[in-house]
Amino acid sequence: MVQCGFNTLVPALVFKLRIFALYPLGNLSTGGYWSNGNGIGVLTSVPGYSPVVNATSIHMDDFNVIHSGGPYTLDANGLVETDDGQVIGVHSHGLLANTPGVKAIMANRTDASPTRWGEIDTFTTWTFQASGKYSELTTATFVANIQLLPSDAEDTVSYINYRLSQVLPGPTCDDADGRGNEL
């Protein structure tokens, strides 16, 4: 099995958001329907991950495009404030599979059920802007798995949870020409 030269993933952060507003913006000339969602929530590190993060969102915006035959395109930006007063910029971009379960949650259907972790086969990439003891987040890249949960209150559109893993270099290849193990 080829292993050298491939990245590894380290569980790092969990971001739990409550989407409280979804604003329709209209059809795009390139296809799809554009909307903006606003959310609030918490960003925390998993046990053993450094830096330790315990933050609450100040503001989160997600400009998303819904394609009838394809996945949703997500593009979220926002700010979180840590429990020690540091502000961290957050950016996420990626896809959300347009499955029947996702459609039911997005349409706020009463029979909608939460998606299971691993059920959605698309992911998002995450980057951060931070300083001080959180500055190492700025030089890292993260990928996230997504879980959606339906609304349970009038002031909630849906819930979206992300499990972020930091992308790290995999083992180096030891052969002289740098190709590593043959595929």
Segments predicted by a language model, with ranges:
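Beta-strand-enriched cores of mature, soluble protein domains
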Residues: 2-183
